[in-house]
Amino acid sequence: MASTGVAGPSFAVAVRAKRGDNTPMAAPLVHAGLEVLYTRDQIARRVAEMGEEISRDFAGQKVVLVGVLKGATIFLADLARCISLDATFDFLSTSSYGKGHQQSGEVKLLKDVDHSVEGQNIILVEDILDTGLTLSYLRRVLSAHQPKSLKIAALLDKPARRIQKIEGDYIGFTIPNKFVVGYGLDYAERYRNLPDICVIPPSALGDE
């Protein structure tokens, strides 16, 4: 058989072994001190279900997925691939968290959508529906663009923290009042790359 010219995994392992390097090629991320709340498999299944629901609700129509930076990026990417519709992306950015994990209570718009969404079906994609302050604010911002419809898709819902009365239209998981990270969610910009959603113990939540 002719060679493809591509060095596959077995070739890479052989080279590493020859060098005396026995380190695994893809070492698993260590959740040191963290409690896994939802595994990557549980997340994938639920996101697929959400995508199917959105596809049914907007069958035959176009949608614009508007993600909230930075936390919703991973969720939006996975959700989009589970939606069998003509979909485009855009992004918003806000500032609402202060130092560490403390929320300031004031929401500021750092970035609006780049393209016109007037007359479009918007799905506002967020990582977590928490106090409701950010999503209530962004709902007003997007409503001012005069869309055809506006729905909210949040991977997580933490109703115990709600300050502003608002509910999501598509919710992945309802969680207890614990600080969670992973799958895009962070603590002081850390842990976003964890594939699972994990709980940080209160003792670790010091202001940095």
What are these language model-derived features?
Residues 1-208:
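PRPP-associated nucleotide enzymes
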